[in-house]
C-alpha cells in the first residue's frame, strides 16, 4: 500500500517576523519545528521568484532569480554584514499584512549596506562559485535589473534606448561598464538569497520535512526571458507579444481571465530539445524536493488571446507540446517528483497527458460541495489515490470564508456530508473530511488550520490590490491548533514515521 502523507501550505511571505514580511529567518525554522511536532511530511510554498507590480509571485522578473524580500536581516547581522541600528526603522503597524510599498522603500538601502559590507570583506570562494555556476541566468538577470532601474523600473519595451532594448553587444558592454556596481548588487543579493534558502531547506530536510515548490507555467512580459531570449516567445519584430495567455469564460468569470503572459514559441523550444525547460526544472529541483507545475493543462492545449484584446472572450485553444516536452525532460533529468495543477477546464487530452506522465493531479474540497451532487469527483469518496488533496489553493477563499458565502443548501449538504455537529468548527470538519480521503497526499492551508475567514484569503484572481498580503502572527499558532493537526494526521494514518515526538 502506498504511504499516506500530509503537509501544510504556507508561503514564506506569510510567516511572522519583525521586518514587514516573512523571511528565511528564525520564524521559518520555527515553522519547520511545528511541522515536525505535528508529524507532517511536506511544507508547500508559493513561487520564490522576484515579484513585480501587483506583488504576485506568479508574475516575476525572472524564471530563475529569487525574491530578495525573503533575505533575513537578523542572519545578516549575525554574519557582520549589518548592525541592529541599520534595520531599526518602522516596518509598519499591522503585523497581519505585508505592505509591499513600504518594503520597496525600506529594504533596498539596507541590502545595499549589506552588499557593501560583503564586498569589503572580499569575495568568498562560495560566492565566486555561485556566480560561475549560475552565470547563464544570473548575468542576464543582473543586467536586466540594473538597466531596468536606470530607466525608472519601466519594462524593457518602454526603454528609450533602442540598442539596449534589442540587447546589441556594444550597447550591452557600455551599460555593463556604467552599471557595474548595480550588477554586483544583484549578484550578491541572489547569492545571499541562495545561501539563506539552502540553510533553511537543509534544516527542513535534516528534520525529514520535504519542500514542495511552485513553478508558474508562464513568465511575465516584463521579464529578463522576454528581453534576452525573445525567440522562445511569439513576438513581433519589436519584441512585443503577439498573443497572451489566459483562461476562457466560465460561470465564475464571464469575461474569462486575461493573464497577459507571453505565449511560448513551442516550435523554437522543440528545435533545441526543450533545453530551456530542462534547465528551468533542474534549477527548481535545486531549490525544492517536489515541484507543483501551475496550469498543467497548458502543456496539452492553452488559451491564446490576441495581445490587443481587452478580455479573454475572443481567445482560442491552441495545441501545446504535450508529452514530447516531458519525454525530453525525462531523458535529460530522469524521473522527477512533480505535482500537476490540473484544475479548471479539463478534457480527455489533458487527462491522458497527466496519466502518461504519471504525475499526481490535484483535488480541491471546496469544489466538491458546489451543486450538492454526491457524484462530484471533487468529493473525497471519489478521490483517486494518485492525487494531492487540498481544502483550497492560494486562489480560493479560506474554507470559513467560502462557507459563510455559500448558499443555505450548500452549507446543509456540506454539514450532512461531513456528519458535522454544531460545535465543530467548519474549518476543522472540512480538514477532517480531507485527511480521511484515500488520496495519498493531503495539504492543509495554514489559514484553514487557524480557522480564518475571507480576510485571510491570499488571492482573488483577476483583481489587483490587496492580494498576497496575509501574514500569520506568532500568537495564532496555538497549542490547540497543533493538537488538532497532529490528531487528524495520526487518526488518518498520515503521520511521518520519522517524527516520534509529543506536542510541546
Annotate each language-model stretch with its function.
Residues 26-33, 195-203, 277-279, 426-430:
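Short alpha-helical segments and helix-capping/turn motifs at coil-helix boundaries
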Residues 36, 197-205, 330, 354-355:
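Surface-exposed amphipathic alpha-helices with a cationic face
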Residues 186-219:
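Conserved, well-ordered alpha-helix/loop/beta-strand core segments that scaffold catalytic motifs
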Amino acid at each position: 500500500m502506498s504511504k499516506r502523507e500530509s503537509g501544510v501550505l504556507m508561503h514564506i511571505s506569510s510567516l511572522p517576523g519583525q521586518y514587514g514580511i516573512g523571511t528565511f529567518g528564525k520564524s521559518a525554522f520555527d515553522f519547520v519545528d511545528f511541522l515536525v511536532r505535528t508529524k507532517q511530511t511536506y511544507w508547500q510554498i508559493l513561487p520564490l521568484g522576484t515579484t513585480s507590480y501587483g506583488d504576485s509571485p506568479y508574475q516575476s522578473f525572472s524564471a530563475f532569480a529569487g525574491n530578495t524580500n525573503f533575505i533575513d536581516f537578523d542572519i545578516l547581522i549575525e554574519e557582520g554584514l549589518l548592525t541592529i541600528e541599520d534595520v531599526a526603522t518602522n516596518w509598519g503597524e499591522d503585523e497581519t499584512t505585508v505592505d509591499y510599498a513600504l518594503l520597496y522603500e525600506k529594504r533596498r538601502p539596507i541590502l545595499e549596506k549589506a552588499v557593501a559590507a560583503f564586498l569589503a570583506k572580499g569575495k568568498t570562494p562560495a560566492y565566486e562559485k555561485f556566480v560561475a555556476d549560475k552565470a547563464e541566468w544570473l548575468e542576464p538577470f543582473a543586467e536586466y535589473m540594473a538597466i531596468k532601474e536606470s530607466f525608472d523600473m519601466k519594462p524593457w519595451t518602454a526603454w528609450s534606448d533602442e540598442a539596449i532594448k534589442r540587447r546589441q553587444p556594444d550597447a550591452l558592454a557600455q551599460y555593463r561598464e556604467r552599471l557595474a556596481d548595480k550588477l554586483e548588487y544583484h549578484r550578491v543579493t541572489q547569492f545571499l538569497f541562495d545561501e539563506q534558502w539552502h540553510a533553511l531547506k537543509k534544516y527542513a530536510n535534516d528534520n525529514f520535512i520535504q519542500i514542495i515548490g511552485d513553478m508558474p507555467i508562464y513568465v511575465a512580459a516584463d521579464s529578463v526571458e522576454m528581453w534576452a531570449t525573445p525567440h522562445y516567445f511569439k513576438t513581433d519584430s519589436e519584441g512585443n507579444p503577439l498573443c497572451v495567455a489566459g483562461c476562457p469564460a466560465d460561470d465564475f468569470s464571464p469575461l474569462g481571465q486575461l493573464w497577459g503572459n507571453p505565449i511560448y514559441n513551442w516550435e523554437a523550444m522543440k528545435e533545441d530539445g526543450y533545453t530551456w525547460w530542462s534547465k528551468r526544472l533542474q534549477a527548481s529541483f535545486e531549490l525544492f524536493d517536489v515541484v507543483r507545475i501551475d496550469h498543467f493543462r497548458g502543456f496539452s492545449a492553452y488559451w491564446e488571446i490576441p495581445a490587443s484584446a481587452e478580455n479573454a472572450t475572443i481567445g482560442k485553444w491552441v495545441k501545446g507540446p504535450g508529452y514530447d516536452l516531458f519525454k525530453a525532460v525525462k531523458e535529460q533529468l530522469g524521473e522527477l517528483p512533480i505535482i500537476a495543477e490540473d484544475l479548471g477546464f479539463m478534457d480527455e487530452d489533458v487527462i491522458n497527458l497527466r496519466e502518461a506522465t504519471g504525475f499526481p493531479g490535484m483535488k480541491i474540497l471546496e469544489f466538491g460541495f458546489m451543486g450538492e451532487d454526491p457524484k462530484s469527483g471533487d468529493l473525497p469518496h471519489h478521490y483517486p489515490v494518485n492525487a494531492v488533496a487540498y481544502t483550497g489553493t492560494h486562489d480560493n477563499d479560506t474554507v470559513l470564508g467560502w462557507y459563510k458565502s455559500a448558499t443555505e443548501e450548500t452549507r446543509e449538504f456540506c454539514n450532512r456530508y461531513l456528519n458535522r455537529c454544531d460545535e465543530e468548527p467548519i474549518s476543522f470538519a472540512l480538514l477532517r473530511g480531507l485527511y480521511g480521503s484515500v488520496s495519498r497526499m493531503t495539504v492543509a492551508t495554514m489559514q484553514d488550520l487557524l480557522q480564518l475567514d475571507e480576510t485571510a484569503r491570499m488571492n482573488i484572481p483577476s483583481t489587483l490590490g490587496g492580494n498576497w498580503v496575509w501574514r500569520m502572527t506568532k500568537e495564532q499558532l496555538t497549542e490547540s491548533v497543533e493538537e488538532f493537526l497532529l490528531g487528524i494526521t495520526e487518526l488518518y494514518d498520515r503521520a511521518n514515521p520519522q517524527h516520534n515526538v509529543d506536542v510541546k
